């Protein structure tokens, strides 16, 4: 009975995800996000670290558990989900999959067009938005940061 309820819930959440795609697609050309490839044009060493981290594969974890449409999951596994110009779907915005630079440092398209020193928010503030007790019970910034330090 619980399995059946869970499957119905999942089906409904997936249907809702696809119902909102048209509206989101209309705003994608005005994106403030550039994606990891744009960032890597200047930050190649940082990009290499990210590519080999769990952040660089975050979206695949959703695919494996059939949750690549669930807004409660996407908000922490992609760039800018439910924000103007952010991730829409794997088909529409593949360049915004995974926990990329802009999740932690903020939208970077304008920075890439006119680089200025001091860009980006502090990682510690970004970490605690997604690394919460119920999803990341063992999260400890001092232990986790060395895994992605750049």
How would you label these PLM feature ranges?
Residues 2-122, 139-150:
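Sequence context of c-type cytochrome heme-c attachment sites
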Residues 127-131:
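Hydrophobic, small-residue-rich alpha-helical packing segments that form membrane-like cores
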């Amino acid at each position: 009975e619980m399995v059946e309820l869970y499957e119905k819930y999942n089906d409904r959440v997936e249907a809702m995800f696809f119902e909102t795609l048209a509206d989101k697609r209309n705003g994608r050309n005005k994106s403030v996000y550039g994606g990891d490839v744009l960032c890597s044009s200047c930050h190649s060493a940082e990009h290499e670290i990210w590519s080999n981290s769990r952040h660089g594969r975050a979206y695949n974890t959703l695919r494996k558990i059939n949750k690549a449409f669930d807004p409660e999951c996407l908000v922490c596994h992609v760039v800018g989900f439910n924000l103007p110009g952010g991730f829409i779907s794997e088909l529409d915005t593949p360049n915004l999959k995974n926990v990329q630079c802009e999740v932690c440092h903020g939208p970077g398209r304008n920075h890439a067009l006119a680089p200025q020193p001091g860009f980006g928010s502090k990682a510690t503030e970004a970490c605690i938005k997604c690394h919460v007790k119920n999803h990341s019970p063992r999260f400890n910034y001092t232990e986790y940061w060395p895994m992605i330090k750049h």
